[in-house]
């Protein structure tokens, strides 16, 4: 009996010892897991600080940052995609594109232009419509009707004649909704291999407002002794149309064409659409792209700090507010021998500039290589 009791006591001690050992291991594991969780949380916190949704800072009396940070869909913090040109360009598929705009009808005339590394072809489709495509991948489809419509609007708010807001007081026209018109335009663009962002600007061109604004524009040009345009004889509901402006995109990135000089418009696709369909289309600098590799990119926080410094060194009463930082792809050059474009991920910085308190201001843009933070001009 004593031996049996001794065995049970020893067995109990072993079990207790094992439990304590197990609890000790479990406790160590919990501590380790807690440390990992805390490290992960800290890492996430640092990442969120580096790649926030918004940056706000008063750098000085004249320089402020209140910037929305815009990332592509499925963006991974600290990572960006590097792309290379791949596929058929607008110039290479110009014959198929012209056929689509001609809608099966024969082309009336073709005019070819060539000098140095530049080529273009202009096609007369009807008495009132035509299309030109260049080796720089610029497409311009135009019509007399679209010209009359575009004569009534100045959408650049840097000019005193700006009236874009007059065409943004309503959303839909009677002949088709804005959304359906946009879907049809987007479908057509996809057919010719052009991807665009849904972040578009739309001007609702109703005939009454166009008639009113056409007269204002005409009078303004006469007062400035500038060559005027030919006014439309009569306006009616048949002239109602939508004027869309958007940007070329790739994998969710806005794509900025090759830049040369002041006044580059980030919205490099514009379309006028009426009850007959597309009556005007301009595409500037489209390059088909495919992914080359994933790269590390700098944070928008660093970009904002980098841009704020030279702005702060400007000695004037002008104020600068950095309002948006958008991760894009930008074409920084083109090899004319191969026809291939050089493309890099970049941060596009939108800055509002005001010369005084009463000045409505205007927006200017700065571009930085997202990998190296080198300025792109």
List where the protein language model places each region:
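Short, solvent-exposed coil/turn segments at beta-strand boundaries
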Residues: 129, 136-138, 272-279, 343-344, ...
């Amino acid at each position: 009996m004593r031996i049996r009791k001794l065995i049970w006591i020893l067995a109990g001690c072993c079990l207790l010892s094992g439990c304590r050992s197990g609890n000790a291991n479990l406790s160590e594991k919990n501590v380790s897991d807690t440390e990992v969780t805390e490290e992960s949380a800290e890492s996430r916190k640092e990442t969120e600080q580096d790649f926030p949704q918004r940056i706000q800072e008063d750098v000085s009396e004249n320089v402020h940052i209140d910037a929305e940070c815009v990332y592509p869909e499925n963006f991974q913090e600290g990572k960006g995609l590097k792309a290379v040109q791949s596929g058929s360009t607008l110039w290479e598929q110009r014959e198929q594109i012209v056929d689509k705009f001609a809608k099966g009808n024969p082309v009336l005339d073709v005019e070819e232009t060539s000098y140095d590394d530049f080529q273009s072809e202009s096609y007369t489709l009807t008495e009132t419509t035509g299309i030109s495509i260049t080796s720089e991948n610029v497409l311009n489809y135009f019509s007399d009707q679209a010209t009359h419509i575009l004569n009534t609007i100045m959408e650049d708010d840097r000019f005193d004649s700006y009236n874009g807001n007059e065409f943004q007081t309503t959303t839909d026209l009677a002949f088709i909704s804005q959304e359906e018109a946009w879907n049809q335009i987007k479908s057509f663009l996809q057919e010719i291999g052009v991807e665009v962002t849904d972040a578009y600007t739309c001007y609702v061109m109703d005939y009454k407002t166009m008639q009113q604004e056409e007269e204002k524009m005409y009078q303004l040009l006469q007062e400035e002794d500038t060559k005027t345009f030919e006014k439309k004889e009569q306006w009616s509901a048949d002239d109602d149309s939508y004027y869309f402006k958007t940007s070329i995109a790739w994998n969710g990135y806005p794509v900025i064409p090759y830049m040369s000089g002041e006044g580059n418009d980030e919205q490099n696709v514009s379309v006028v659409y009426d009850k007959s369909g597309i009556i005007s289309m301009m595409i500037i600098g489209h390059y088909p792209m495919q992914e080359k590799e994933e790269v590390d990119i700098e944070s928008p926080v660093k970009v904002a700090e980098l841009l704020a410094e030279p702005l702060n060194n400007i000695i004037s009463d002008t104020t600068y507010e950095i309002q948006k930082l958008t991760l894009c792809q930008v074409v920084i050059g083109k090899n004319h021998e191969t026809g291939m474009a050089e493309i890099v991920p970049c941060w596009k910085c939108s800055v509002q500039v005001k010369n005084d308190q009463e000045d409505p201001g205007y927006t200017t843009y700065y571009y930085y290589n997202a990998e190296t933070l080198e300025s792109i001009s």
